Structures are given as C-alpha cells and as structure tokens.
C-alpha cells in the first residue's frame, strides 16, 4: 500500500514496509517570507523565486510520515506571512486615490542603491564565461577609440594606443557582494564597510584589458504585482553584476543594467505608487533581472508609471514601453520558466 508523506518539502509516496530512518529528506521548520525573500526557518537558503523556494531540497533526513503534522509555533525572528497577517489591523480600508496623492512624498528625495542578490545559477554562468574567454579577447583594435576606459572592474587604465594592450590589467573577475553593511568582491573576499574603500580595492587577477564600448540595448521588459509587491523584470543574457546598479527613491526608479556583449539597458521611471526603499531589492539571474519593490501601502497599482510622467513622455515622444502587467494575486508569477536556469542551479 502506497501512502503520501506529509513531511514538508517531501510529498512523495512511500511503502510503509520499506520506510527506513533515512528514506525522507524534508524541512522540519516552517516557511519564512520576509522582504520578498522566501525560505525555511531550518536552513539558510533564501530566494525571491517562489517555485525555487518550493524546490529547495530538504535539510534533514528521517523516516516518511503518513500523518498530517500539527502546525508548529511561529519562530522568533524574521516575520512570516502568518505573523504579518496577525499584525495587520482588522478591517483595514485601502486608502483612496486622493489620500494617496495628498500623502505622496516629494520627487526630489535622493535615491538609494538597491542591494543586488546574485543567483547561484548566474554565479556559475559567470565562472564559465571567465573560463571560456579572457576579458578583451577578440576585440578589433581598429574599433577602439583613444581615451576609452578599461571595462574590467577594479582597473582604471585608459586606452592611449596599441601600446596600452601591452600593459597588464589588474581587475576583479568576480561579482560585488553587499551583506549586512559589508562590501566585498566574490573573487577575493576582502570586506569593508566604506563604499569608497570598496571601489578602490586593487584587483586580484592579472589579465588583458577590455576596451569594449557599451551599446544601448532595447531589452524586453514587463512588470507584475501582488498586493504588497511590484516586480519589474528586464530580460537579457548574463547580466554583469560589477556594472549593474538600480537606484530607487519612494517614488522613482533608475535602472542601469549591463548584459554580456556590453549591451546596456537604461530607464528612469516615475512610479505610480510609493515604495519602501529599505525593503526593496534586485535579483540577478542568467536570463533576466528582477527588481522587487515593496509597496509602502498595500493595494493594486493601475499602472507602473505615474500618469504625469506618461503625459510628459508622450509629448516628448519618449517612453518606457512596459509590457502589460501580468500578475493577478500570487507570488507564483515570480517562478522561473527557463529549464536551463533550473539545471544550472542544481
């Protein structure tokens, strides 16, 4: 007789006669959802991708369990979805459009850099790219302009002619890491609190200069939302973390993304609603970049951009042509659809 295992993260059918002490790989903890990140309280892995969260492998081995487990008490620490619901005041009435307009912060507030979360699949793709081709290889010197800067992170060399190729390039082949205020490069691990000191860190590898010119690219992009979150997605192959930045204020978004091949996507968006900058973040994956903006007030946005900004862009003939908002009401829209990403992340 085949029974269904109710251990979290398992869900397999098993034969009680062959149920061994190490037959089941599961999560003994509870789901944790905090600042758009999803994970289990029993292990450290976190992701913004809902289907990747569902596929996080169990961290504990034991026998299968055919009985439904009682609900465990919520752990202290990061807020879970249940605890957030408990804290929500009863009968909360959404603010009217007039109230939101009146309470909208001034647009001249300085933007802040959003933290970049680099997926394991992208790290593997960047490592493979580093093995396949050295920076600057195959670039036609006749196309390089005098005064061009080396594009490798950590190198400040300027092209003065063919003799510049003979000088060594000291650079960082890895990606920048920002965690709990500390800043470092994944390739050398020297940590610092000061952003200026981080930028001035000398490279840890010697190679060839990359004089490639970055080209503005027209990338496919769209957005979707839940009651508490707006996700802007820009599609492109192999975003380069060292050159990417996304800034946001409560009402504006500034995007600068560099993909493989020196293709650059840039956009400035005056947001329809107000966001919580401190809780927002950016996730880099092999085939796209997801910008997760946490709404300051729950509710649905009629569109991504503010009507005033759309009117101004319409007059000037310039606009950010976002694909239609796709999501309805679930974080399922954050799921990965590319089979190659799933294979790389395993």
From Swiss-Prot:
Residues 70-113, 311-346 are annotated as: Disordered. Zn(2+) 2 binds at residues 27, 42-43, 59. It comes from Sus scrofa (Pig). Residues 79-94 have a biased composition (Polar residues). Residues 5-64, 150-209 form the CHORD domain. Interacts with beta-1 integrin subunit. This interaction is regulated by divalent cations, and it occurs only in absence of calcium. Zn(2+) 1 binds at residues 5, 10, 24, 64. GO terms for biological process: centrosome duplication. Residues 98-109 have a biased composition (Basic and acidic residues). Keywords: Metal-binding, Repeat, SH3-binding, Zinc. The tail domain binds to the cytoplasmic domain of both integrin beta-1a and beta-1d isoforms. The presence of Ca(2+) ions does not prevent binding of a fragment consisting of the second cysteine rich repeat and the tail domain but prevents the binding of the full-length protein. PROSITE patterns: CHORD (PS51401), CS (PS51203). A motif (SH3-binding) lies at residues 28-31, 70-78, 173-176. Pfam families: CHORD (PF04968), CS (PF04969). This is Integrin beta-1-binding protein 2. A motif (SH2-binding) lies at residues 159-162, 235-238. SUPFAM superfamilies: HSP20-like chaperones. One of its GO terms (molecular function) is zinc ion binding. Residues 216-305 form the CS domain. Residues 321-346 have a biased composition (Acidic residues). Zn(2+) 4 binds at residues 172, 187-188, 204.
């Amino acid at each position: 007789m085949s029974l269904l295992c109710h251990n979290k993260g398992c869900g397999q059918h098993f034969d009680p006669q062959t149920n061994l002490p190490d037959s089941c790989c599961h999560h003994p903890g509870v789901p944790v959802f905090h600042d758009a990140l999803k994970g289990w309280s029993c292990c450290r892995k976190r992701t913004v991708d809902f289907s990747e969260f569902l596929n996080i492998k169990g961290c504990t081995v034991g026998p299968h369990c055919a009985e439904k487990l009682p609900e465990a008490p919520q752990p202290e620490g990061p807020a879970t979805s249940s605890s957030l619901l408990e804290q929500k005041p009863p009968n909360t009435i959404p603010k009217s459009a007039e109230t939101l307009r009146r309470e909208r912060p001034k647009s001249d507030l300085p933007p802040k850099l959003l933290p970049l979360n680099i997926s394991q699949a992208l790290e593997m793709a960047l490592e493979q790219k580093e093995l396949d081709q050295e920076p600057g290889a195959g670039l036609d010197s006749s196309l390089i302009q005098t005064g061009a800067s080396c594009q490798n992170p950590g190198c400040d060399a300027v092209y003065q002619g063919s003799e510049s190729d003979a000088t060594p390039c000291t650079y960082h082949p890895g990606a920048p890491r920002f965690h709990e205020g500390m800043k470092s490069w994944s390739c050398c691990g020297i940590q610092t609190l000061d952003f200026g000191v981080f930028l001035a860190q000398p490279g840890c590898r010697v190679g060839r200069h990359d004089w490639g010119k970055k080209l503005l690219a027209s990338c496919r992009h769209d957005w979707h939302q839940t009651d508490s979150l707006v996700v802007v997605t820009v599609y492109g192959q192999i975003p380069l973390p060292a050159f990417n930045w996304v800034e946001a204020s409560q009402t504006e978004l500034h995007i600068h993304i560099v993909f493989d091949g020196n293709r650059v996507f840039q956009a400035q968006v005056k947001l329809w609603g107000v966001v919580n900058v401190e809780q927002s973040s950016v996730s880099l994956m092999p085939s796209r970049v997801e910008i997760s903006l946490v709404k300051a007030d729950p509710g649905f946005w009629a569109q991504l951009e503010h009507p005033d900004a759309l009117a101004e862009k319409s007059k000037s003939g310039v606009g950010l042509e976002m694909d239609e908002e796709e999501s309805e009401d679930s974080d399922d829209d954050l799921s990965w659809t590319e089979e190659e990403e799933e294979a790389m992340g395993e």
